[in-house]
Design a protein with these regions (language model features):
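Short Ser/Thr-interspersed hydrophobic loop/turn segments at strand-loop and sheet-helix junctions
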Residues: 2-3
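M16 family metallopeptidases and their MPP-like homologs
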Residues: 7-60, 65-116, 131-140
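Low-complexity, intrinsically disordered Gly/Pro/Thr-rich segments
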Residues: 117-126
Length: 140
């Protein structure tokens, strides 16, 4: 997923960050998506350029089948593990019902994932990762 992509680009290939992650938070009428990384102050600009480059890659061309299928497999595994934690599953179910006025089980989620394609994912990336719609907050 995105966390892996960011950690490879920022930490493994360049040794610039201590940690890197992306998060998605859903609310009733909107969502926020964020990237977080921790680095030395002198590496901030370089890290921001690398993150932008990774986002641009996702916007410019669809994932190849191997990467796409590996990501789907990972997501399905994470959903399965999350469902094993009954308290977390109950909270997630309640949040989904609160936000969307409906509940979809794991089977429904997997059905939606089957409809996903690399091209569709690329189209969503073009919309979400457009630099004009992103903001940057830097804590020093």
């Amino acid at each position: 997923g995105m966390n892996s992509r960011l950690n490879i680009a920022l930490r493994e290939h360049n040794g610039l960050v201590y940690t890197a992650e992306s998060t998605l938070t859903n609310y009733t009428d909107t969502s926020t998506w964020a990237i977080y990384f921790g680095c030395d102050p002198e590496n901030i600009d370089k890290c921001l350029r690398i993150v932008r480059k990774e986002l641009d890659k996702l916007m410019e061309s669809p994932l190849n089948d191997r990467v796409f299928n590996a990501a789907l497999k990972q997501i399905k595994g994470q959903i399965g593990v999350a469902c094993d934690n009954f308290e977390s599953y109950a909270l997630d179910t309640a949040k989904a019902y609160l936000h969307y006025n409906k509940f979809e089980g794991m089977e429904d989620t997997f059905k939606h994932l089957k409809e996903l394609t690399p091209s569709l994912l690329q189209e969503v990336a073009k919309e979400i990762f457009d630099a004009k719609g992103l903001n940057t907050l830097i804590f020093k």
